[in-house]
Amino acid sequence: MNRELIVNVNPTEISIALCEDKVLVELNKEQCQTGFSVGDIYLGKVRKIMPGLNAAFVNIGHEKDAFIHYLDLGSQFPSLQKLVASQQPGKRGMRVEGMKLEPPVEKTGKIGDYLQVGQNIMVQIAKEAISTKGPR
């Protein structure tokens, strides 16, 4: 079975179509929002590492940087990061099917072992911005 995902983005709407053997199976349309919502996924850039908090601040385009704690990286962060790095402009992307999983993140590790300032990472909003604090 041949599956194809088609994404169309314009200023007011995002459309995602799933086709199987060139037959439309599913179609989702969503109005574009300018705000940041829980569940949204962004490609961000690490702005600051805070070793004392075992956390980092990430620029995702919000007026305040997002906060990510070491425990929020997830056990498969190294594998996900390898995939994100391969998808950057000027690099040849990798196929997810053939990707080998990296060893999982240790629960007692340090964020500086996995992140560095200027690094691009994929993040998902778990908590919206409140008062003077950015998203988490």
Where are these regions (language model features)?
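Single-stranded RNA-binding surfaces
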Residues: 1-136
